[in-house]
Amino acid sequence: MTEISILNDVQKIIVLDYGSQYNQLIARRIREFGVFSELKSHKITAQELREINPIGIVLSGGPNSVYADNAFGIDPEIFELGIPILGICYGMQLITHKLGGKVVPAGQAGNREYGQSTLHLRETSKLFSGTPQEQLVLMSHGDAVTEIPEGFHLVGDSNDCPYAAIENTEKNLYGIQFHPEVRHSVYGNDILQNFAISICGARGDWSMDNFIDMEIAKIRETVGDRKVLLGLSGGVDSSVVGVLLQKAIGDQLTCIFVDHGLLRKDEGDQVMGMLGGKFGLNIIRVDASKRFLDLLADVEDPEKKRKIIGNEFVYVFDDEASKLKGVDFLAQGTLYTDIIESGTETAQTIKSHHNVGGLPEDMQFELIEPLNTLFKDEVRALGIALGMPEEIVWRQPFPGPGLAIRVMGAITEEKLETVRESDAILREEIAKAGLDRDVWQYFTVNTGVRSVGVMGDGRTYDYTIAIRAITSIDGMTADFAQLPWDVLKKISTRIVNEVDHVNRIVYDITSKPPATVEWE
């Protein structure tokens, strides 16, 4: 059985990746309607799409001009498949350009648009059913369509864009110059839902139960009767992977819990108790803290930290695997967001991810990444569907490199202890305030900055701890959480009084973007 045959019974909409910073959100929004969706390379052929058998195709936006020497193209036979196609921004320009219309640099036409604009609908359309004649949308385009291809007609325009929405209903081709996938397009979700349900004919019946069945079948086909190693960190992602793999292959799974000395307070014992005890996973606990901390001594660059941890993690696995027989696979809790942040063919690398860019080329295992098409909120939903308790599913996200990337600069035991203890206080107080479900992620960071303070009658010169708390839906964008002042005050007071070598607390009020969630 191939992956394609496993997916044949699942309706799906494929998003072709042309490099937009928002393209992963298109798939995310479509999934909200109960329709499976994923990104594929713009280089995909019509024949490959026939084999995947999607009910719809979306051409994403992108930063390039259709006239650029390195412009991303499309197999022209895709337009002849008879499958509904929606072109967004660059996608609309590409449809126009390839089918005989005219696209010009927007500056030449005097109609460059960035930011919110008002869309004026001139005709009724299935794509805009149930939305008002005038609506706010997010425009972000350098080129613009000035002549549409034969068979197309105008659906909507804006003050600076003569063709903001076009369609050819006979061929099921649709184009919009704006981005419906972002919240700034007020009726964007309605538009995408109209495309998925009304135009593509989606049933809207895809769920985590479907995903579980699909992944279990894929895992069994991939693994066969061979054995899998999973690195457990104690975080949500690896825990969910562990339970999913256990359900798929049972005792063919061996979990290795590497205690690299960079864990949160009491985390090692909690991992063994929850997953080893309650779920019966076969877990080997390895104390490798000295190996990791020795390698990380005096290392300040965050990318070097990630690479060292990623490499050493695999070497520890090699050591343990050599004691076992017939282990061929390494499972990881890589998410969709991890892959995107590590860069794709069309997108710039933001930072290498510990589950993506830190692995050596001569790694001795094949990789299995069952969650690499899911966003964080979907992983939590998967955990619930697998019968996992909420205390595991809603556990705070924790990066593979652990506290190494929450200690700025060189790592010392003293700095690690300040983060462990301050983070435990933060989590305790957030829970006491009943905010643990409202705040998507929260943790502390040792900034590496020392400052002068006064404690008792004496002068201090100690570390500054930063609190990072964010709200988010899928981890792709985030806002800083507006925690109540009384809660922040209590957290600050407890940390400076209970944690040695800390005399100052600051609160990170930066959204993502421009910042990432983690400081390193």
Swiss-Prot record:
EC code(s) of this entry: 6.3.5.2
Domain Glutamine amidotransferase type-1: 12-205
Cellular component GO terms, alphabetical: cytosol
Known catalytic reactions: XMP + L-glutamine + ATP + H2O = GMP + L-glutamate + AMP + diphosphate + 2 H(+)
SUPFAM superfamilies reported for this sequence: Adenine nucleotide alpha hydrolases-like, Class I glutamine amidotransferase-like, GMP synthetase C-terminal dimerisation domain
Protein's pathway: Purine metabolism; GMP biosynthesis; GMP from XMP (L-Gln route): step 1/1
Domain GMPS ATP-PPase: 206-395
The organism's place on the tree of life at top rank: Bacteria
Stored CDD domains: GATase1_GMP_Synthase, GMP_synthase_C
Pfam families: GATase, GMP_synt_C, NAD_synthase
InterPro entries membership: Class_I_gatase-like, GATASE, GMP_synth_C, GMP_synth_GATase, GMP_synthase, GMPS_ATP_PPase_dom, NAD/GMP_synthase, Rossmann-like_a/b/a_fold
The protein's enzyme class: ligase
UniProt-listed Gene3D superfamilies: 3.30.300.10, 3.40.50.880, HUPs
Cited function: Catalyzes the synthesis of GMP from XMP.
NCBIfam families reported for this sequence: guaA_Cterm, guaA_Nterm, PRK00074.1
Quaternary structure, from the entry: Homodimer.
PANTHER family, A to Z: GMP SYNTHASE [GLUTAMINE-HYDROLYZING], GMP SYNTHASE-RELATED
Name of the protein: GMP synthase [glutamine-hydrolyzing]
Provenance organism: Streptococcus pyogenes serotype M12 (strain MGAS2096)
